[in-house]
Curated annotation (Swiss-Prot):
Compositional bias of kind Polar residues: 1-10
Sequence similarity: Belongs to the major facilitator superfamily. TCR/Tet family.
SUPFAM superfamilies the UniProt entry points to: MFS general substrate transporter
Alphabetized GO MF terms: transmembrane transporter activity
Coiled-coil residue windows: none
Magnesium is among the record's keywords: no
Gene3D superfamilies per the UniProt record, alphabetical: MFS general substrate transporter like domains (1.20.1250.20), Multidrug resistance protein D (1.20.1720.10)
Membrane-crossing segments per the record: 61-81, 96-116, 126-146, 159-179, 184-204, 215-235, 251-271, 288-308, 330-350, 363-383, 392-412, 424-444, 456-476, 527-547
Biased composition (Basic and acidic residues): 24-39, 565-581
Protein's name in the database: Dehydrocurvularin exporter
Amino acid sequence: MTDSPSLESNNKSDMDTPRPPASSHDEHDAAESVSEKQDSATTSPTGKLEPEYLTGLRLGLVMFTIFVSTILVSLEIGIIATAIPGITNDFRKLDDVGWYGSATFILAAAASPLWGKLYKYLNVKWVYLSAVGIFLVGSIVAAAAPNSVAVIVGRALQGWGASGVLGGTLIVINYVAPPRNHPLLIGTWMAVFMMSTILGPVIGGAFTSGVSWRWCFWINLPVGGPIVVLLLLFLRVPKHVKPVPATWKEIILNLDIPGFCLLLVSLVCLTLALQWGGQTKTWDDGSVIATLVLWILLTIGFFIVEWLQGARAMAPLSILKQRMTWSNVIFCLVSYAALYQVMFYLPIYFQSIHGQSAVTSGVNTLPFLAFFALGAMVSGGAIGKTRYTQPYELAGALIMTAGMALIYILDVDSPKAKYIGAEVLFGFGIGLCNQVPMTAVQGFSKPDEVASATGIMVMCQTLSGAYFVAIAQSLFANRMLHALNSGSDHLDVALVLGTGASELQDVFSGDDLTAVIDAYMVGIKDVFAFSLACAAFSVILTALIPFKRLPDHEKKPSKDAMASDEVKASEEVQQEKKVTV
């Protein structure tokens, strides 16, 4: 990577005329990393600017702005669940139902590392605004969709923008807030994200039944407009969080477009195979087998390309090879699998088995939300004090597994006290450990790798959704249909699949309704069993996570250490110039 022309000329001049480190302009810029979180700054004896973080009202305004942006995009993740019946009534495309949710996760997973690179090389504020803009464009496309394909395209654009907003929010927190506040702020952000995601179906149900499913997307415009204004007014990244100098050609090469394309197409192939297999086509159908084979080949190709790309890869080996990173990546993938399945299928349990409306089922998930938020803030505050992360991942995984076991034993006649108790335990456990991997990876990353590391972690979170939500949907549909065909083969399978969970009581009656509810329970139980396995496996995975104390970046290094760091940074820049053509 080369410096800009002005920096390069300065470097040449400095090499010809030796001078003290304190006056070396090029070394000052080279050593200055993208994770320095200053607003105003003081100069150290080596010429580097010491960190001074936002506090008080200024920090509060930035946090408020990015948290509101998070609410905007996270509502759309869950809102589609109750909008689907209205969409299928308009377009009559039952085969596309799975894509309305999957398209968002697929684009979010594939694009997250790209956003991390963009935040590294470009102005943080304008990249963040671009992500919000793409999300709003996707909302317009979905709201005005003349057909089912347009809805899918709109949802994909929403996922693309949402990944930039979510990743950008975590990057901004890392840049502007004091390091010891990061765990609590990330925990609070995670609570806001989860509450918005789960309340999405409630809002979607109100719009779908009261106005139109299109308002699930139109509503983003009057809400998004003021958010853009807030971002323009209050999103202030510290002055010394500067983009890494690079030409446009270098930026494009570092985006790793080949890796992005391979990952995107592989996810599409897997989703197609899981949506066809056992539902619209048999598992031994040629198209199902072909898409599964393509998924395997493309995934292998993706890893080969990532290895060949080296430092330009979407997930650079220099970041992933660190034990603190790869162990938390795996833990994140598996724990999020348990979370997503409960998040999507617990409301289905309430609506299909207990006959609750979307609004009532949303109210019954509030205990889960409340204790998730409590767990996230407890672990965030505790990590801020102790600076250790692994104990909270272990404790959270254990409590989450116990709660998941209680959720698994729920049945058609389970009383309210039973499912509320299970929710509380699971919510508190997943809340304790959910945001910790992000905190750990950011905390142990090198300053110039924070943006890329954040992109990788957001990719893991959304990739877990892309993979495991699709797997859970396939498992649920296949097991439900098998149970239905075994007990009541006279029922119309297409009608059962096309009926929303909250509408079963209106469409079916008598023995048919009983048969459908029993079949739903079989499918839901298998999904919960899968989620329980993921939760239990996450307990084992905590043994891989290092027991280390988070570094305290607020401590000012000694003069000798700063001088040594500056020399190293200058040498790295000179070396990059030699190897970059």
